[in-house]
């Protein structure tokens, strides 16, 4: 069912947003005209945000979602519904899952309604090129009959921040570190309002991975970003007075993983990834009381079949016949 009501960004007041959020929470499609208005509204908010967002505790950190809408609902059930819980999402909202459209629209609506309680930063899948390969573009065309919604959403990707810092102690990013970046100031001066480059510091922040046994920097098997070792993580934390680096980007079967004597934490929030990996997911809960201690996680499983619903079977593409 398509929700047909439409309003411009200036007309999207709290009551309008509440109504749209209620619709979006049911995993119902919102019409293209309304999506355009939502994108315009969230753009007005994101354009004012810095490359590095400053966040206060308490906040709950979420890793990759990848269009698994019903598992996002499970995440909210476990972690608390907005605005009762403050959330920092580390990117990769779309691709691979069945409901990338509904997932990203809901997160944009929540950002519009609660801009100080929802923080969205960019992942490597918030990219025009990547989403044309891994599902988001095709899903938009299938559900809306054209690529216009994809175009509106990918324009918003360019405005997402690149990193966040919690209480001046935790550095949060989608992927990892860059040999080109020693201090936060070097992130602050980047021009982020572009398509994700194939190389360079912005690319590295979204694509890099920690690697045990790596000294300094290594070549990434992903073909973008770098592998970075514990020494690189230690130096970055020392240079910027950080306790820890929090990132997502890698599937972790247990939902989270501690690297380099807890200097780096991976958080993964898509349970049973791609509906077949069998992993659990996690969120990381950060408070003023626990930020200096070991990380605190809530682990959760995929939504049940009853709560998930099944995607409609699509016609088989001709090249498979």
From Swiss-Prot:
Pfam families: Metallophos. Its cofactor is Mn(2+). Binds 2 manganese ions per subunit. CDD domains: MPP_PP2A_PP4_PP6. The gene is pph-4.2. Protein phosphatase which seems to be involved in larval development but not essential for embryogenesis. SMART domains: PP2Ac. This is Serine/threonine-protein phosphatase 4 catalytic subunit 2. It comes from Caenorhabditis elegans.
